[in-house]
C-alpha cells in the first residue's frame, strides 16, 4: 500500500527536523549596516531557511492566530471524531475487533491532547479552546457530522477518513511551527496504522458473504465524497491557503492534496474489489493523474455552517460529556493543589 511511502515521508520530515535544529540561521542577510534589523526580519529569515519557529520566538500576530485556529480545529476534530467510531465499540463483531477499535479511539484522544498542548504553547489556555468549540466559535472537521450506520462504516472511516487525514497531515510534519510539526510526526505514525486497520476491515467484508460485500460497498459509496470534501474548499475559494503556504504552515493547496488522495485510493479500491462512486473517474494520461468529479462544495459549506446530518448531536454530546466530567476536573485540580501545598 501507499502507506509505506507516506511513512517514509514522515521519517524524512523527522530527520529534517533534527537536522534543522542543528543548523543556525544567518539573520544578518544582505542588509546594509545602516538599516536596523527588525524582529520581522528575523522571523522571515527563519521561515526562509526552513528552520522552526519556537514558542519563545517573536512571531506576527496573524501567524499566531492562524496557528491557533488551525491547531485548535484539528484538536477539536480528533475529540469529536471519537464519537462516530465510539458508537461501534459495544457492537464490534468480535473481541479482537473491539480491542482494536478501543485502541484506535484512545489514540484519537491522545492526538487531541498533543494538539491542545501544541496550541497552548501559543499562549492560549485549553479551557478557552474547549469553550470556543462548545460555543460554536471554533470549528471541527466536516467529516464527523456524518453518521456511522453499519460496521462497514468503521472500515470506511479507517481507510478513507484516516487515509485523507494522512495525506493532509504528512506535509504538516514540515510545518514551520516546531511544536505542531513535532506533534504531527507522532500523529502520522499512528494514523498510518489506523488506515491499515480500516483497509483490513473492508478487505475482510469485501471477500465475505454477498451481504457483507454489499455493506462494504454501501459504506464506501457514502464516505467517498465527504472524505474528498475534508480537504476544504477549492483553492480559488480558500481563505487561508495562500498566506499559510507563504508562512510554511501548509505546504500544499487543498486541491493538490485532494488529487493525491484520489490517486492513492484508486489502486487500493481495486485491491479491495470495491468501486469508487464516481462515473467520471478515469486515468488522465496527459496529466498523469486520475480525473474525478469534485465533491459538492455547497454541501461542505452547509455542513461547516452547522447543517450537516449530525452537527447538533455531536456538539450536544460533547457539551454533556464536558458537564458530566466537571467533578473529575475539580477533583484532579484539588488533588494537584493538595500535593503542591496550595489551593485549587
Ligand atoms: N471542515 O481557507 P481554508 C482526523 C474551513 S482529524 C470544517 O482552505 P485552511 C481524524 C476553514 O477552517 C481531521 N471546516 O482553510 C480524527 C476556513 O474557515 P475559518 C482534521 C473546514 O485552514 C479522528 C474555511 O473553511 N484535520 O483526520 O487553510 C479520527 C476556508 O478554508 C474544512 C485537520 O484539522 C473542513 N473539512 O484549510 C479519524 C488538519 N475545510 O476557520 C480522523 C489540519 C475548510 O476561516 N487542518 N474549512 O472560519 C488543515 O490542514 C486545514 O485547516 C484544512 C483547511 C485543510 C482543513
Which residues does each predicted region cover?
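Acidic/His metal-coordination segments adjacent to aromatic residues that form catalytic metal sites
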Residues: 52-72, 132-158, 175, 208-212, ...
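Extended, helix-rich structural scaffolds rather than catalytic motifs
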Residues: 2-21, 214-344
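Glycine- and acidic-residue-rich phosphate-binding/metal-coordinating active-site segment common to enzymes
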Residues: 175-226
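Helix-loop segments that flank and shape redox-cofactor active sites
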Residues: 57-63, 81-103, 165-180
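Extreme N-terminal leader/anchor segments
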Residues: 1-63, 95, 326-344
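Conserved alpha-helical segments that form or flank metal/cofactor-binding pockets of metalloenzymes
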Residues: 22-40, 104-132, 199-202
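Internal, conserved structured core segments that host functional sites
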Residues: 146-197
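Alpha-helical scaffold segments that form or flank carboxylate-/histidine-based iron centers
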Residues: 63-74, 92-111, 154, 179-191, ...
Amino acid at each position: 500500500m501507499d502507506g509505506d511511502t507516506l511513512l517514509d515521508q514522515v521519517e524524512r520530515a523527522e530527520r529534517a527536523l533534527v537536522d534543522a535544529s542543528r543548523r543556525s540561521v544567518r539573520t544578518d542577510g544582505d542588509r546594509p549596516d545602516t538599516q536596523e534589523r527588525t524582529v520581522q526580519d528575523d522571523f522571515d529569515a527563519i521561515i526562509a531557511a526552513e528552520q522552526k519557529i519556537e514558542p519563545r520566538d517573536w512571531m506576527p500576530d496573524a501567524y499566531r492566530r492562524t496557528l491557533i485556529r488551525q491547531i485548535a480545529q484539528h484538536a477539536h476534530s480528533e475529540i469529536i471524531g471519537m464519537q462516530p467510531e465510539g458508537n461501534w465499540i459495544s457492537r464490534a463483531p468480535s473481541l479482537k475487533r473491539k480491542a482494536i477499535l478501543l485502541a484506535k479511539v484512545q489514540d484519537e484522544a491522545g492526538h487531541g491532547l498533543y494538539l491542545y498542548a501544541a496550541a497552548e504553547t501559543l499562549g492560549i489556555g485549553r479551557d478557552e479552546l474547549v469553550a470556543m468549540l462548545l460555543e460554536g466559535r471554533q470549528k471541527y472537521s466536516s467529516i464527523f457530522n456524518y453518521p456511522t450506520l453499519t460496521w462497514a462504516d468503521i472500515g470506511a472511516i479507517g481507510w478513507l477518513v484516516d487515509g485523507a487525514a494522512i495525506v493532509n497531515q504528512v506535509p504538516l510534519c514540515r510545518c514551520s511551527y516546531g511544536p505542531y510539526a513535532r506533534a504531527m510526526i507522532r500523529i502520522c505514525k499512528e494514523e498510518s496504522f489506523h488506515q491499515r486497520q480500516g483497509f483490513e476491515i473492508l478487505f475482510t467484508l469485501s471477500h465475505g458473504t454477498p451481504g457483507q460485500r454489499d455493506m462494504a460497498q454501501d459504506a464506501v459509496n457514502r464516505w467517498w465524497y465527504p472524505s474528498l470534501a475534508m480537504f476544504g474548499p477549492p483553492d480559488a475559494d480558500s481563505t487561508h491557503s495562500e498566506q499559510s503556504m507563504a508562512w510554511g504552515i501548509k505546504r500544499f493547496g487543498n486541491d493538490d492534496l485532494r488529487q493525491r488522495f484520489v490517486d492513492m485510493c484508486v489502486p487500493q479500491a481495486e485491491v479491495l474489489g470495491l468501486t469508487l462512486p464516481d462515473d467520471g473517474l478515469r486515468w488522465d494520461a496527459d496529466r498523469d493523474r486520475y480525473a474525478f468529479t469534485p465533491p459538492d462544495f455547497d454541501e461542505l459549506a452547509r455542513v461547516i455552517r452547522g447543517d450537516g446530518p449530525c452537527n447538533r448531536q455531536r456538539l450536544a454530546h460533547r457539551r454533556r460529556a464536558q458537564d458530566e466530567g466537571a467533578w473529575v476536573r475539580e477533583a484532579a485540580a484539588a488533588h494537584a493543589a493538595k500535593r503542591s501545598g496550595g489551593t485549587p
